[in-house]
């Protein structure tokens, strides 16, 4: 499958905007949660970088596969992104904390992070999807 320049630009824009959005949302959340400490704003760039890697590994290949059916703001695509996001967050949690891997399902942050990450990527993918 060959990618033309327009499609490649769309993938890159989706990846960049999703990573920056994710970093901004969770970085600002940590800024407020830390009591408005200015140093917490550095986390925006750190979170955006980690989001870029995660989106590149998990969401970008899925995006290429889902783009075979070109539908903007498809609820089915959103649910697929959510399922992959749950799997990705679980995988990273399992690698970091193997003995406590199942405790993450009791964590509210697990669900929020997964759903927000999926929503952000799905939203930007739908915005940059061109017919």
UniProtKB/Swiss-Prot annotation:
Its main location: membrane. The chain crosses the membrane at residues 12-32, 38-58, 75-95, 108-128. It is found in: Cell membrane. One of its GO terms (cellular component) is plasma membrane. Pfam families: UPF0715. It is a multi-pass membrane protein. Keywords: Cell membrane, Membrane, Transmembrane, Transmembrane helix. Belongs to the UPF0715 family. This is SPbeta prophage-derived UPF0715 membrane protein YopD. It comes from Bacillus subtilis (strain 168).
């Amino acid at each position: 499958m060959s990618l033309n320049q327009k499609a490649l630009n769309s993938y890159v824009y989706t990846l960049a905007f999703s990573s920056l959005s994710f970093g901004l949302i969770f970085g600002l959340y940590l800024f407020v949660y830390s009591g408005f400490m200015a140093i917490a704003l550095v986390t925006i760039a750190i979170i955006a970088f980690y989001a870029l890697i995660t989106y590149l590994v998990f969401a970008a290949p899925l995006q290429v596969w889902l783009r075979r059916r070109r539908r903007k703001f498809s609820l089915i695509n959103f649910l697929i992104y959510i399922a992959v996001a749950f799997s990705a967050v679980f995988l990273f949690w399992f690698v970091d904390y193997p003995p406590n891997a199942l405790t993450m399902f009791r964590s509210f942050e697990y669900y929020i992070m997964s759903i927000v990450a999926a929503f952000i990527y799905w939203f930007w993918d739908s915005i940059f999807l061109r017919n």
